[in-house]
Amino acid sequence: MLRNDTITAIATPPGEGSIAIVRVSGPDAISISDRIFSGNIAGYASHTAHLGTVSHNAVCIDQALVLVMRAPRSFTGEDIVEFQCHGGYFACSQIVNALLAEGARAALPGEFSQRAFLNGKIDLIQAEAIQQLIAADNIDAFRIAQNQFQGHTSQAISSISSLIIEALAYIEVLADFPEEDIETEDSLPKHRIMEALSITDELLSSFDEGQRLAQGTSIVLAGLPNAGKSSILNALTQKNRAIVTDIPGTTRDILEENWVLQGKNLRLIDSAGLRETENLVEKEGIARAREAMSQAEGILWVVDASQPLPEFPTILYQKPTILLWNKCDIVSPPQIEVPFQQISVSAKTGEGLLELKQALQKWLNTTQLGKSSKIFLVSARHHSLLHSVYTCLTAALNGFTEHLPNECIALDLRQALHSIGNLSGSEVTENVLGEIFSKFCIGK
């Protein structure tokens, strides 16, 4: 990728809006922008804003507010100019065309963030957090990404790296001076490796919880056919997402719907009604329903209050479960003793849905991020590389127990540092960078 040219792109989403932003970055950002602006951008101080007119070939394009950020005190570390013009498509696209005509190049997806990384303004972990911030669809995903962007994850990785480097330096001294009788069983390198292992293990153990928080808590609606599972899904999400009929066995596959409740993300899963059947398609749907129940973090067991009480599967007693007595608008549910919460609802009238939402909110509040700086891994790339670090550190630690040569232990530590380099970006390949930043939007 060329790093000595100047790039431009629209930085705001397409469509109607009050303001659109065109971003320019590179060594000629100021001179190129100056040629299409009525003011004197070349003479403006850094971090100042100026109102003027954007024109090209003697044709006025729009009135715009220009922001000037000079290198190295900018997001990319280069000279940056931003044009804030009227929203919509035409004004910003014509400004981009004018900038291209004056010598700028159209930016690639994520190229502004990539330049920030290459110029040392952010590390790769922080760069990836930018995309996570943009893609966050619930408050927990946003907070996890915000913590990562603020550098909390990077600081933990840096601590691991420092401990490994300290251990490696000590071991290399032992390798260089084998004649010295230095006891290593309880030595500094072993303790440093154990400290690094502890931090690595803590990060790895946060992955499942981080995934749950970012992607949403999975809750299955399960029960007999025609109990009202699909109707309750539609009522909660206020969408006609699931097909509803009076024919038993209408739902024959897993249907998943993301639903944000008070900023928290849930994955509501509608499933096939559980019953004995000879229909091969329905039988497969029931098998998938049971699998979904086994993997879900919670179950809404839906019962038609007007029908005989069905047998409760064992799994209801093994997971957080709420018993939903549906059709309470036409019949009062029976009084039974069960070890989980019971709520009377009506998918038809909406009765009881507020109580159900409040119960679900309590489930979701089990893990509260709040303003905490707790680190959660959510990236599969980060998890894979940290797992490699953990494996190498474990091998190095075992090397002490097995009295392996110091050179072997040092080799494991160097491999751990290599994985950390790939994680932070200090040793990452150009192909990996291309893959990561290609997922970004143009203009970011």
Curated annotation (Swiss-Prot):
List the molecular function annotations (GO) for this entry.
GTP binding; GTPase activity; metal ion binding
Localization, per the record, is: Cytoplasm
**Cellular component, GO annotation:** cytoplasm; cytosol
Q: Domain named TrmE-type G: which ranges?
A: 216-365
Q: Key word Acetylation present in the record?
A: no
The record's keywords, sorted A to Z, are: Cytoplasm, GTP-binding, Hydrolase, Magnesium, Metal-binding, Nucleotide-binding, Potassium, tRNA processing
GO BP annotations listed? tRNA methylation; tRNA wobble uridine modification
Group of enzyme by EC: hydrolase
Chain positions recorded as Mg(2+) binding sites: 230, 251
Annotated binding of K(+), by residue = 226, 245, 247, 250
- Enzyme Commission number, as recorded: 3.6.-.-
Cofactor(s) required for function per UniProt: K(+)
Highest taxon, organism lineage: Bacteria
Residue positions annotated to bind GTP are: 226-231, 245-251, 270-273
Q: Which family does the record claim for this protein?
A: Belongs to the TRAFAC class TrmE-Era-EngA-EngB-Septin-like GTPase superfamily. TrmE GTPase family.
Question: Record's NCBIfam families?
Answer: mnmE_trmE_thdF, small_GTP
Q: What is the documented function of this protein? A: Exhibits a very high intrinsic GTPase hydrolysis rate. Involved in the addition of a carboxymethylaminomethyl (cmnm) group at the wobble position (U34) of certain tRNAs, forming tRNA-cmnm(5)s(2)U34.
Annotated protein name in UniProt: tRNA modification GTPase MnmE
